[in-house]
Amino acid sequence: MSCPNYCSGNSNSGSLRTSRHIPLTSIDLCPTSVSCGDVLYLPTSSQDHTWVTDNCQETCGEPTSCQPVHCETGNLETSCGSSTAYYVPRPCQGSSFLPASFFSSSCLPVSCRPQRYVSSGCRPLRPLLNSYQPIGDCVPNAYRPQFCLSKSCQPQNLLTSGCQPSSCLAYRPQSLHVVSSSLRPLGPLFSGCQPLTHVFSTCRPSCSGL
């Protein structure tokens, strides 16, 4: 089975993924004499002519890991300087991610090439935790992801299997110094007013000479 649409070039194929600078004049666009599984040199950028070596020796049948996760017709790019485009794995930005696998040499139509690399092809260097691990007495609703993934390598759907509380968000009632209804004030109020000095209820005139 041959791949009718793909690009190739000449370069050493030692590692799984190699960047090469190849002049456009030496690129043979989309020949039909190479079968699936052969080494391809796919462009990562049409500006600097950097090509990616795809040494993924896979069968002609496109495996699950080589299928685009999501195809958006409005989010396309064209490579090889022609009207033919290819699904090229994009490297994950950031030091904590590596490509999990490369796509086979089978070519995919332009309608199935996302503009940005999808995180399903990326795996963290340190595996995510498979369960929630509370730190202290935390309520379940207070869990948050331990770290954020790079914006250039975001998953299609939110991942919830690798969460860890970044801080304890305990929903405990805080004391507002509320006075209980059974407490009395320090200075109880009297039901009536009492003068500081005694006032006689009757007045007696002083003696005066008549």
Curated annotation (Swiss-Prot):
Localized high up in the well differentiated portion of the hair follicle cuticle (about 10-15 cell layers above the apex of the dermal papilla). Keywords: Keratin, Repeat. One of its GO terms (cellular component) is keratin filament. InterPro entries: Keratin_matx (IPR007659), KRTAP_PMG (IPR007951). The keyword Repeat applies. One of its GO terms (molecular function) is structural molecule activity. Belongs to the PMG family. In the hair cortex, hair keratin intermediate filaments are embedded in an interfilamentous matrix, consisting of hair keratin-associated proteins (KRTAP), which are essential for the formation of a rigid and resistant hair shaft through their extensive disulfide bond cross-linking with abundant cysteine residues of hair keratins. The matrix proteins include the high-sulfur and high-glycine-tyrosine keratins. Interacts with hair keratins. This is Keratin-associated protein 26-1. The gene is KRTAP26-1.
